[in-house]
Amino acid sequence: MTEQQPIAVLGGGSFGTAIANLLAENGQAVRQWMRDPEQAEAIRSRRENPRYLKGVKVHPGVEPVTDLERTLADCQLIFVALPSSALRKVLQPHQLALTDKLLVSLTKGIEAHTFKLMSEILEEIAPQARIGVISGPNLAREIAEHELTATVVASEDDELCARVQAALHGRTFRVYASRDRFGVELGGALKNVYAIMAGLAAAMDMGENTRSMLITRALAEMTRFAVKLGANPMTFLGLAGVGDLIVTCSSPKSRNYQVGHALGEGLSLEQAVSRLGETAEGVNTLRVLKEKSDEMQVYMPLVAGLHAILFEGRTLAQVIQLLMRGEPKTDVDFIPTTGF
């Protein structure tokens, strides 16, 4: 199925560009909106996004644009790849233009002052729109370089899921569907925090046992927190949970992993984020997640430990000592431990 109208991708970053390329390769006409006219002109003239995805050719079917009002008017299916800190500011003035649109969030973040996920913000801005999210183990550069990849589109709107699958599904990109939008989106946001910790552990040359422990305990923490908020724990055993967690905590291509690695090399948080040159959602998510988990009294020792290192002046050695002294609880929280 080929969309009769062009499809919009909002955001000029690496992931937005990778998704725009996939759509164009599948025969779709794509309008990729970005705020910076110089960036748009660079992509238009060089067919490359030199700032965020250097070395990857941008498909001729991707048209970089800077007129947001016209882009929203022309397109029915709209992928939103804006930073979490900018999403509301960019789209709020155009809420009438979003009525009855299909809005699919690609952003894995949480709004700091409200603890709202991106799809919840989209619902606030455009209550008459149809909302979905995409999440999974999806490193932008690997998608752009046609590594075999799978993702999840999640929405209670089955037709929206089907349209996204038809638009994106291709020879190297497989799209599964889920109705647990909240769980899928929450998994994508939470794992960024643990990727920072994984990068820090790698820079400190910690062993494979340690890294495995961190990833599996991170999964337990994520699931414990998400279930308290009403998500389906089974979602965290799929691509948007353990799948995304593994790739983000294992790959130097992950932005949040890079921030953690830079911290382990001795850089300050400000220096680490500055060196990255892109948005690392995990830093902001850590702040709001620590506050929310304390408020809800959810046991999240890894979150508390990383927060202590980044924002409370604790050293890694001090935090490790506290973590290893903690009382060990059950390994898996969501099955009975009696009768086995």
Swiss-Prot record:
Q: For this UniProt record, give its keywords in alphabetical order, as a comma-separated list.
A: Cytoplasm, Lipid biosynthesis, Lipid metabolism, NAD, NADP, Nucleotide-binding, Oxidoreductase, Phospholipid biosynthesis, Phospholipid metabolism
Q: Which GO terms describe its biological process?
A: carbohydrate metabolic process; glycerol-3-phosphate biosynthetic process; glycerol-3-phosphate catabolic process; glycerophospholipid biosynthetic process
Alphabetized Pfam families for the sequence: NAD_Gly3P_dh_C, NAD_Gly3P_dh_N
Q: What is its main location?
A: cytoplasm
Q: What is its EC number?
A: 1.1.1.94
Top-level EC class as recorded in UniProt? oxidoreductase
Entry annotation: catalytic residues: 191
| Location in or out of the cell | Cytoplasm
Which pathway does UniProt place it in? Membrane lipid metabolism; glycerophospholipid metabolism
The catalysed reaction is:
sn-glycerol 3-phosphate + NAD(+) = dihydroxyacetone phosphate + NADH + H(+); sn-glycerol 3-phosphate + NADP(+) = dihydroxyacetone phosphate + NADPH + H(+)
Does the record carry Nucleotide-binding as a key word? Answer: yes
- The residues the record assigns to binding NADPH are 14-15, 35, 108, 140, 255, 281
Q: Which InterPro entries match?
A: 6-PGluconate_DH-like_C_sf, 6PGD_dom2, G3P_DH_NAD-dep, G3P_DH_NAD-dep_C, G3P_DH_NAD-dep_N, NAD(P)-bd_dom_sf
Which GO cellular component does the record give, naming just one?
cytosol
The positions annotated for binding sn-glycerol 3-phosphate are 108, 136, 191, 244, 254-256
Judging by the UniProt lineage, the source's domain of life is Bacteria
Extract one GO molecular function annotation from the record. Answer: glycerol-3-phosphate dehydrogenase [NAD(P)+] activity
For this chain, the family text in UniProt reads: Belongs to the NAD-dependent glycerol-3-phosphate dehydrogenase family.
Role description: Catalyzes the reduction of the glycolytic intermediate dihydroxyacetone phosphate (DHAP) to sn-glycerol 3-phosphate (G3P), the key precursor for phospholipid synthesis.
- Protein name, please? Glycerol-3-phosphate dehydrogenase [NAD(P)+]
Q: Which organism is it from?
A: Pseudomonas paraeruginosa (strain DSM 24068 / PA7) (Pseudomonas aeruginosa (strain PA7))
Q: Which gene encodes it?
A: gpsA
